[in-house]
Amino acid sequence: MASSGEDISNDDDDMHPAAAGMADGVHLLGFSDEILLHILSHVPSTDLILNVRRTCRKLAALCLDKSLIHTVLLQKDYQASEDKVRQLVKEIGREIQQLSMAGCYWLPGSTVEHVARCRSLVKVNLSGCHLTSLRLSKMLSALQHLRSLAIDVSPGFDASQLSSECKATLSRVRELKQTLFTPSYGVVPCCTSLEKLLLYFEILDRTREGAILSGQLMVGQSNVPHYQNLRVFYARLAPGYINQEVVRLYLAVLSDRTPQNLHAFLISVPGSFAESGATKNLLDSMARNVVLDALQLPKSWLNGSSLLQHMKFNNPFYFSFSRCTLSGGHLIQQVINGGKDLRSLASLNLSGCVHCLSPDSLLRKAEDDIDSSILETLVASCCNLRHLNLSAAHHHSSEGLGRHLCQLLARLRHLRSLSLPVCSVADSAPRADRAPAQPAMHAVPRGFGKKVRVGVQSCPSPFSGQACPQPSSVFWSLLKNLPFLEHLELIGSNFSSAMPRNEPAIRNSLPPCSRAQSVGDSEVAAIGQLAFLRHLTLAQLPSVLTGSGLVNIGLQCQQLRSLSLANLGMMGKVVYMPALSDMLKHCKRLRDLRLEQPYFSANAQFFQALSQCPSLQRLCLVSRSGTLQPDAVLAFMARCLQVVMCHLFTGESLATCKSLQQSLLRSFQAERPALNVVIFPLLHEGLTDVIRDVPLVHLDEITLFKSRVAEEPPNLWW
């Protein structure tokens, strides 16, 4: 899985320069081998070997160049059918040294097993693939050169079925990424040379039949993890108590003897995770014996603790203090050491740290203005930051020349991804000479009925030019100074998705921050300055009147790959539909679209507009009381041949949803092996059971809403 939202899949629509050359009368084969190899590197491996290679002698030779076949990436190659993968392995398997089949959930174990033919493999990523213990054993027994492995551990896994040859291979593995769907050590005890361990805990508290699972493992001398050479430990937990129980068993061994070479220790836990005696011993040992360059801890381990001031860091590149009650004073004193040079820091996650830009957390209210001197110190010390997350907090700037949050962040010229709360980009506190905007939800009930926005002038034409960004806007200036930004998130500080993980759908959300009322179409239009933008999230912008700024983005952000829009404008009416339809005409490279909006009508007009996105692969719609037209969905899927994921959660009846889902699968499954369709009522009590069957790659990347900037360290996994 790509970290921090990075897109590492093959990009065959980047071959346009060659097409342009041919239009000028230059034949493709007239280019040098070096240029041709660069062009061919953007062609999916299956297409390269099974099709392009057979066109002529020159391409036949180039397609077998080591630079193209030593590393094969099949993740997100949704056209990679069973036959294609088997044929690919048969033809170049012996040459492949690095193979990623991450998220290839549609391939059966019998096909994945063919990886055993790639005997030169050094790295292989099989996360999301179906493999039994016996098949894994057979495959690993043949891969004697393997040093990096990523697998899933599913119910039924039995380490006793692993052969001695398999265990010999595992003993040489230095990097392991293991996604756990059942309480287990997996293959960790067999990996006696581990230097990097990544653990993803996705264990559900109950079985499908409702039985409560136990997190206890059979712990014996033979199945204790070996951590003596460990340099990187990373654990990410999905919600649920059982994931916390199991991770404690992994941590218990670390607390007995902390590896001296440990330099990255990261635990990502939603909610609270109580500190135990063993974890306290581990942290004390780390403070005494190790020097870290990456750190993330559960908020309950840091809140009220002096731990940070005892930790030792050397050229740190990643910090995450997400949801911690870290004050700005502590941030400066304990992390930045009063302004110490932290030019090495590449990624910083302060999401949900509501007091991190204020000197003291005890006397501050959430809506109080920030202390700009703290942010100024942070910016000066961490001048090479590439990824910064300040979402899920109220970071309000006071009046003051050059002291606005946007003006200070504009100094971070190396930023490539940025996540901000909507209220933080408002120009300033409302002035006496400016009529205040009417809050979108304050004057209306918060039940299921449609909300009527009062005190707002009638909407102008979406294309009247009123969304042109104002050069005097601090947000406009910020984006002007960050022209190479690739990932931008503007998320309302009070926003919560209607579809959380492992819980019923949320029926109501908190009203937006009052400062967010002055952020609307003009600010959205300013995003059009970002010519290199690839990923965009806009959530809870109540003052979007027409969505005309979206057209600006569609016209100018031609690199846009993923778009997530949630709760824009008035909650009782989708006011931006005409603008969105016009925007989509220009999104030729858009692959992922997620829309979350109450009362959204997924009608023929919407799907007709969506059909103009030729690269679209994944669609997710979440709409309380929303409607859809089954015929329009079927026609859209017939026109858009690249779409392999269609998730629609609306207010339609269960019968309507089931009928449409069956029709889609019956019509398109045979031609699209990776097709994943979920059509289900958003507020139905069975939603949790439906979600558990969604492939993790889709669930994690698009179906569930979350901030993805600085979510993980850069380049955590290849």
UniProtKB/Swiss-Prot annotation:
CDD domains recorded: F-box_FBXL18
Domain named F-box: residues: 25-72
Quaternary structure note: Directly interacts with SKP1 and CUL1.
Signal peptide coordinates: none
Superkingdom field: Eukaryota
Summary of the function given for this chain in its UniProt record: Substrate-recognition component of the SCF (SKP1-CUL1-F-box protein)-type E3 ubiquitin ligase complex.
Organism, as annotated: Homo sapiens
Single GO cellular component term: cytosol
Protein name (record): F-box/LRR-repeat protein 18
Disulfide cross-links: none
Cited InterPro entries: F-box-like_dom_sf, F-box_dom, FBXL18_F-box, FBXL18_LRR, LRR_dom_sf
GO BP annotation list: SCF-dependent proteasomal ubiquitin-dependent protein catabolic process
LRR repeats: 77-103, 104-128, 129-153, 177-201, 324-352, 367-392, 393-422, 468-492, 516-540, 542-567, 572-597, 599-623
Keyword Repeat: yes
Keyword check for Cell membrane: no
Alphabetized UniProt keyword annotations: Leucine-rich repeat, Repeat, Ubl conjugation pathway
